Amino acid sequence: MKPLNIIFAGTPDFAARHLQALIDSEHNIIGVYSQPDRPAGRGKKLQASPVKSLAIEHNLPVFQPKSLRDEQAQAELANLNADIMVVVAYGLILPKVVLDTPKLGCINVHGSILPRWRGAAPIQRALWAGDTETGVTIMQMDIGLDTGDMLLKTRLPIEDNDTSASLYEKLALQGPDALIEALTGLAKGELTAEKQDESLANYAEKLSKEEAELDWSKSALELWREIRAFNPWPISHFTHQDASIKVRESAVSNLSSDAPAGTIISAGKQGIDIATGDGVLTLLNMQLPGKKPLSVGDILNSRGEWFTPGTLLNSKKLIGKEPAVKEAE
């Protein structure tokens, strides 16, 4: 197999892990593209991206155009005479002229099994939707949003204890191996591109802070998925005692209750049980404003009066007598 001359384009840590795999491979990296340095930290000093830092460490040429729509930037890229361009979480739009520049075009590492979740937040949306698996797709890029032909797919089961953070780590390990396998197949001419089935496509819109507010009228199952999907950002939260309280871990309880949604059913070291639109959700780990995340047991030691059974969340009043609960059938 003849090694490929590769342009790599990426910005965050997830992308840097794929660049490292290319550095360790037999292929030639002839240029690394990353977004311009951004102000970061308290001093707002310009900070290089993880991809740029890794490229400099290995003496690879770095390019940081503000846009690839610029003719000069396009000419500079064309002069590299690449066989292929690998794009991983780059963050800039690639116009058609750029997509068509490398001999084998541009390929992308996408964190889902296409066409299930296209877009910016496939990991989070897969969790929230209750998908049982996710994975990595290596695809040939076109002018659409994650609509290109699929070259290779890997699969990964979603476990009950997975959060977006844990799935991110798992896919960050799986992605580089999939990328190298796909490049080997392309270099040997052994990969067959597969068209995406448009009828199976969904758009994984970027998460917003507004979506992170817990709606107790939803089912316990949906809220449990939501809390996992929004960890580590933006973290699901609810308002109670005029405080925004973040929820980092929860579980679907085997209890049932006919109390209004948002009612505290019980509170103890094992968790705080909340009535929902369907079922009971147990809160296990929370974070009060300005404090570090703590187990519910520790929070009750200092704020036990906030979580009296029978209290309706986002209220300081009891709704009546302590609600009756029973084991779910």
Curated annotation (Swiss-Prot):
- Fetch the Pfam families from UniProt: Formyl_trans_C (PF02911), Formyl_trans_N (PF00551)
Residues the record lists as binding (6S)-5,6,7,8-tetrahydrofolate? S112, I113, L114, P115
Question: Which CDD domains does the record cross-reference, listed alphabetically?
Answer: FMT_core_Met-tRNA-FMT_N, Met_tRNA_FMT_C
- Kindly list the GO molecular function terms attached to this UniProt entry: methionyl-tRNA formyltransferase activity
**CC annotations in GO:** cytosol
The record's top EC class is transferase
The alphabetized UniProt keywords are: Protein biosynthesis, Transferase
**InterPro entries registered for this protein in UniProt:** Fmt, Formyl_trans_C, Formyl_trans_C_sf, Formyl_transf_N, Formyl_transf_N_sf, Formyl_transferase-like_C_sf, GART_AS, Met-tRNA-FMT_C
Q: What's its catalytic activity? A: L-methionyl-tRNA(fMet) + (6R)-10-formyltetrahydrofolate = N-formyl-L-methionyl-tRNA(fMet) + (6S)-5,6,7,8-tetrahydrofolate + H(+)
Q: Mind telling me which SUPFAM superfamilies this protein's record contains?
A: FMT C-terminal domain-like, Formyltransferase
Q: Classify the source by domain of life.
A: Bacteria
Report the Gene3D superfamilies cross-referenced here.
Formyl transferase, C-terminal domain, Formyl transferase, N-terminal domain
Q: What is its EC number?
A: 2.1.2.9
Q: What does this protein do?
A: Attaches a formyl group to the free amino group of methionyl-tRNA(fMet). The formyl group appears to play a dual role in the initiator identity of N-formylmethionyl-tRNA by promoting its recognition by IF2 and preventing the misappropriation of this tRNA by the elongation apparatus.
* Alphabetized HAMAP family for the sequence: Formyl_trans
Q: Which family does the record claim for this protein? A: Belongs to the Fmt family.
Protein known as: Methionyl-tRNA formyltransferase
